């Protein structure tokens, strides 16, 4: 019987073990999409305790705790840090079968070195004290953990109005070699249907010194901010497309739509689609001219619990998978961007695994001549960021495209302890390829498949994003 979380965790064939230990394990981490707070990296934040680094802001854990009957006070409320950690420790034994159980113990093992001990009510105090003592050390600050985990690059998620002063501070610090680059997340600039849109237009106009009245004014304001981001090393954009829309409109129509919204009027769904299409097509061309990568995260159904949204706000664990069709609108959006050969490198993620084959085939329609893997089907996202979800995504990518050109894993996380998700991903990748070899579906060619694993673990992403390390 295999031991839980051994050095050969998930590596159930000899070939998988060789792939992982000889090719994957020592590869650096290129974390091209995350939600780490850049100010904590800039100031080399020292975490107060295990709650501060591990549970604070983690909606995955809160969701599991609520399911386990834990009161909200112990999730997001006013309980002490220890009380919240104790409640999490009492929940962990009930998470077997959930990726949280694997993540929890991988994160305790690295970087804290906790092995052979499972988190539970009986072990909580010992783990709390041990890890808190380690967090007082210099190698367990925000930067220290990144260095321990062999991180080479992180891409944070940033709004166009952000001043990026923290990224600038990190870039100017010659004692810290890890690249910390902004990613452009302009959702607030095109989600015209939201009540917050007009206030955001005022803020965008202020930071860009632009009076936004016409669609061309919005383009001017965004261009100035794109230039600002580019000056700070940005090469990546990210868009939350909860619903994919497409409806064309000329500039005069877009001017009218924007003017009506700024006047406080409510728009039709068709007008919303026209405006979003106009912004996304224009932005895509800007990305292409600048050599940026665009990411589309598709299919989240957000803020389902209105009572809790009013109490706690967004991004606290009340989101789920949407089932709106996306194929036709996405095809038209990408095709429109491609008309003038201004479709940038693009990564598509779907939250509904039903859409895996849709994206797996969609990327094949728009691959670029002379550019390996220009269009990417992104790694299993959010609810698919688990063993079965990763296997499904990679299997379908292999069957419908080229797994060998895949840019691999990203944490998409707010926690400095989430880098072990790259280890988890690499183990699953090696397990999958090892089984192909075991079943005679792939040759037992270690150099060939080892190079493929190495590329997916690091090199493909480094080359794709073209960021000098």
From Swiss-Prot:
Pathway assignment: Carbohydrate metabolism; pentose and glucuronate interconversion
Signal peptide as annotated in the record: none
Assigned EC number: 5.3.1.12
BP GO terms, sorted: D-galacturonate catabolic process; D-glucuronate catabolic process
Pfam family, one: UxaC
Keyword Isomerase part of the UniProt annotation: yes
InterPro entries registered for this protein in UniProt: Metal_Hydrolase, Uronate_isomerase
A GO MF term: glucuronate isomerase activity
Assigned keywords, A-Z: Isomerase
Catalytic activity: D-glucuronate = D-fructuronate; aldehydo-D-galacturonate = keto-D-tagaturonate
UniProt keyword Isomerase, yes or no: yes
NCBIfam families: PRK02925.1
Alphabetical list of PANTHER family matching this protein: URONATE ISOMERASE (PTHR30068:SF4)
Family: Belongs to the metallo-dependent hydrolases superfamily. Uronate isomerase family.
Name of the protein in its database record: Uronate isomerase
Species of provenance: Pectobacterium atrosepticum (strain SCRI 1043 / ATCC BAA-672) (Erwinia carotovora subsp. atroseptica)
């Amino acid at each position: 019987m295999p031991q839980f979380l051994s050095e050969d965790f998930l590596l159930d064939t000899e070939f998988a073990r060789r792939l992982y230990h000889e090719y994957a394990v020592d590869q650096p981490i290129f974390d091209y999409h995350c939600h780490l707070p850049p100010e904590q990296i800039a100031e080399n934040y020292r975490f107060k305790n295990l709650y501060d680094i591990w549970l604070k802001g983690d909606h995955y854990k809160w969701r599991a705790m609520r399911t386990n009957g834990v009161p909200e006070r112990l999730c997001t409320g006013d309980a002490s840090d220890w009380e919240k950690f104790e409640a999490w420790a009492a929940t962990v034994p009930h998470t077997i079968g959930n990726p949280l159980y694997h993540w929890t113990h991988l994160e305790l093992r690295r970087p804290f070195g906790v092995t052979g001990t499972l988190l539970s009510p009986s072990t909580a105090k010992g783990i709390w004290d041990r890890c808190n003592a380690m967090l007082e050390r210099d190698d367990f600050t925000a930067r220290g953990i990144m260095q321990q985990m062999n991180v080479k690059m992180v891409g944070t998620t940033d709004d166009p109005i952000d001043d990026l002063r923290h990224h600038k501070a990190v870039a100017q610090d010659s004692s810290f070699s890890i690249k910390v680059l902004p990613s452009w997340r302009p959702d607030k600039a095109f989600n015209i249907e939201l009540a917050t849109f007009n206030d955001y237009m005022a803020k965008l106009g202020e930071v860009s010194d632009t009076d936004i009245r016409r669609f061309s004014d919005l383009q001017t304001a965004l261009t100035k901010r794109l230039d600002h981001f580019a000056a700070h090393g940005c090469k990546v954009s990210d868009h939350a497309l909860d619903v994919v829309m497409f409806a064309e409109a000329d500039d005069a129509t877009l001017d009218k739509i924007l003017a009506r919204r700024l006047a406080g009027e409510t728009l039709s769904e068709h007008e919303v689609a026209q405006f979003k299409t106009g912004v996304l097509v224009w932005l895509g061309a800007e990305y292409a001219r600048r050599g940026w990568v665009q990411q589309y995260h598709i299919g989240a159904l957000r803020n389902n619990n209105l009572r809790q949204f009013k109490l706690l706000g967004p991004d606290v664990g009340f989101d789920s998978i949407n089932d709106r069709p996306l194929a036709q609108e996405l095809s038209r959006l990408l095709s429109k961007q491609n008309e003038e050969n201004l479709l940038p490198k693009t990564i598509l993620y779907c939250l509904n695994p039903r859409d895996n084959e849709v994206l797996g085939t969609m990327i094949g329609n728009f691959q670029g001549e002379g550019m390996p893997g220009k269009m990417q089907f992104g790694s299993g996202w959010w609810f698919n960021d688990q063993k079965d979800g990763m296997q499904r995504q990679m299997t379908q990518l292999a069957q419908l495209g080229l797994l060998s050109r895949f840019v691999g894993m990203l944490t998409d996380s707010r926690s400095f302890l989430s880098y072990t998700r790259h280890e988890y991903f690499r183990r699953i990748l090696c397990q999958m390829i090892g089984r192909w070899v075991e079943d005679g579906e792939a040759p037992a060619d270690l150099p060939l498949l080892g190079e493929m694993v190495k590329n997916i673990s690091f090199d493909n992403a480094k080359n794709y994003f073209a960021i000098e390390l």
